[in-house]
């Protein structure tokens, strides 16, 4: 698989779980002989929600909530067949969304 690049995008709400999963992917790729570029931290997406506290009248009383989505980018350059097999068998945390492009 010379000249190919595998691009992996990871998303999670908790940055600690995201960093642990990223480190696990990097260690697996390096152990099988592939070159890794990254992890590159991408901008966080912050969604803010404003809701009324009470069900009836008091419009001035509100709560604000936010969800932060943390993202990382990895490039695996010139992956070997062993690298692809190891990445397919890798078991990552449940809270991490993974997108892979070859």
UniProtKB/Swiss-Prot annotation:
Function according to Swiss-Prot or TrEMBL: Involved in the binding of tRNA to the ribosomes.
Quaternary structure note: Part of the 30S ribosomal subunit.
Annotated organism of origin: Cereibacter sphaeroides (strain ATCC 17023 / DSM 158 / JCM 6121 / CCUG 31486 / LMG 2827 / NBRC 12203 / NCIMB 8253 / ATH 2.4.1.) (Rhodobacter sphaeroides)
Coiled-coil annotated residue ranges, if any: none
Keyword Hydrolase: no
Superkingdom classification of source: Bacteria
InterPro entries: Ribosomal_uS10, Ribosomal_uS10_dom, Ribosomal_uS10_dom_sf
Keywords on record: Ribonucleoprotein, Ribosomal protein
GO cellular-component term (any): ribonucleoprotein complex
Family named by the database record: Belongs to the universal ribosomal protein uS10 family.
Stretches that traverse the bilayer: none
The organism's taxonomic lineage, starting at the top: Bacteria, Pseudomonadati, Pseudomonadota, Alphaproteobacteria, Rhodobacterales
Presence of keyword Ligase: no
GO biological-process terms attached to the record: translation
Pfam families linked to this entry: Ribosomal_S10
GO molecular function: structural constituent of ribosome; tRNA binding
PANTHER family recorded: 30S RIBOSOMAL PROTEIN S10 FAMILY MEMBER
Protein name: Small ribosomal subunit protein uS10
């Amino acid at each position: 698989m010379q000249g190919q690049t595998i691009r992996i995008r990871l998303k999670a709400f908790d940055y600690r779980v995201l960093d642990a999963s990223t480190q696990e992917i990097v260690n697996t790729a390096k152990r099988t002989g592939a070159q890794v570029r990254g992890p590159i931290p991408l901008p966080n997406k912050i969604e803010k929600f404003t809701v009324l506290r009470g069900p009836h009248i008091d419009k001035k009383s509100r709560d604000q909530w936010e969800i932060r989505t943390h993202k990382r980018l990895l490039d695996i350059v010139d992956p070997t067949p062993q690298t692809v097999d190891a990445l397919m068998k890798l078991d990552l945390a449940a809270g991490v969304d993974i997108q892979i492009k070859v």
